[in-house]
């Protein structure tokens, strides 16, 4: 699919989502991966918009959490924000919107189209594009429809100190320690992004991404706890018990 066709698809997408744009250039940039920008003249990647969008979502989510959740501490508010303004959470929203289908990316990088971090970046970039093109009022309409309902369903108890919660659960079945395998991602993604794999006895229970090792580890622990709540929980219990017998 060529750029012209993608832009036509973008215009239709914006119309369907009640975003009456003033300047399409913001949205084109928001959906342009740097591998595509590197191969084409006079087009910029979404990197700077992703930076702006991240800052906007941090602020907007903080205000919403303060208004929506009663009697919470600063630490609890930070946990709720970290749970929702993270790669996995924003990636889910991006995929629901279908942003990756509109992504301009080099042919050699097509395998990255469904990448979690890239989809999260797309959501942040798209938020920045709406803000820069149409202002705060229109962005609020968009966030009320797409983003705030996602935050409002957060169960605070389920996200309190996910690393300790997972460790306590594992220790109830096994004496083996858990570890976090940290990888710094570079090249096609971006430097200063960390991937954390939560591992126990050679098995990966959760994977997280973050701009710091701490954030990546917390997200990995959160994903691991979600795995334990899934239908496969009994299978995991049996596997851990089997380890104890060995």
Swiss-Prot record:
Matching entries from Gene3D superfamilies are given as: 3.30.160.20, Ribonuclease III domain
GO terms for cellular component: cytoplasm
Which residues are catalytic? 54, 124
- Where mainly found? cytoplasm
The residues covered by the DRBM domain are 161-230
- What InterPro entries would the database entry show? dsRBD_dom, RNase_III, RNase_III_dom, RNase_III_sf
Q: Which GO terms describe its molecular function?
A: double-stranded RNA binding; metal ion binding; ribonuclease III activity; rRNA binding
- Please write the reaction equations for the catalytic activity of this protein: Endonucleolytic cleavage to 5'-phosphomonoester
Which positions does UniProt annotate for Mg(2+) binding? 50, 121, 124
- Domain named RNase III is located at 10-135
The reply on keyword S-adenosyl-L-methionine is no
Q: Which keywords appear in this protein's UniProt record, sorted alphabetically? A: Cytoplasm, Endonuclease, Hydrolase, Magnesium, Metal-binding, mRNA processing, Nuclease, RNA-binding, rRNA processing, rRNA-binding, tRNA processing
Q: Which Pfam families match?
A: dsrm, Ribonucleas_3_3
Give the SMART domains listed for this entry. Answer: DSRM (SM00358), RIBOc (SM00535)
Q: Membrane spanning segments where?
A: none
Homology family:
Belongs to the ribonuclease III family.
NCBIfam families assigned: RNaseIII
Instruction: Report quaternary structure and partners.
Output: Homodimer.
The protein's name = Ribonuclease 3
Organism, by scientific name, is: Mycoplasma mobile (strain ATCC 43663 / 163K / NCTC 11711) (Mesomycoplasma mobile)
Q: Which lineage ranks, top first, belong to the organism behind this chain?
A: Bacteria, Bacillati, Mycoplasmatota, Mycoplasmoidales, Metamycoplasmataceae
Point out the gene that encodes the protein.
rnc
